[in-house]
């Protein structure tokens, strides 16, 4: 494979955005229904920090980035899964959030049926993008799909974490690992796999970043919604697990520092 190393973070972000736009454009071609296509575009752009896909690309970069297209597809698929989870998480059945990334959530901007279909379509698109670029490296593709689906399904992924919100009691650390850290772990492991390297040494990095990210998000849930860009105090209103609610603000800060 030809090596192609990112020289700057800006270069990485620009190529990532180009790839995301291309994926959404391909999914929006005729005979795609215009409203659903618009909802998918709305869910992806403008993006947030793109932490997960950039983390995946950074790991690929550190591993030599010997298959640029596959590493980029891996990063795009991680972001697609993440955005799909946000669309579903914001629905009235879950958080009933009205604002995400400083604008109305998908079900508010469109409607609930389109939001459900949008999330579902992004999940499928994540797999499509990955397989399209992975056929040239089948030995890596199988591992990538396994990591991505494991991190999003049952019993180790986002769906499992979301499901725990319906239980009466839950260990906060386990909840954070499943709902948030699992996709960060996927990002680091997929970054390594797509570059032909062993993913396991990178798993702990994803785990720690993911847990820290969720605790920080829990703290942000009690901040000003104009600053955070999303609906706040939803965890308290919906009785969701939250580090601040369980540990107090200072306890949550200490937990963040310990991670």
Explain the meaning of each model-derived region:
Residues 25:
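Glycine-rich, acidic and aromatic/proline-enriched surface loops and short helix-turn segments
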Residues 28:
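Cationic, histidine-enriched alpha-helical/coil surfaces that engage anionic ligands
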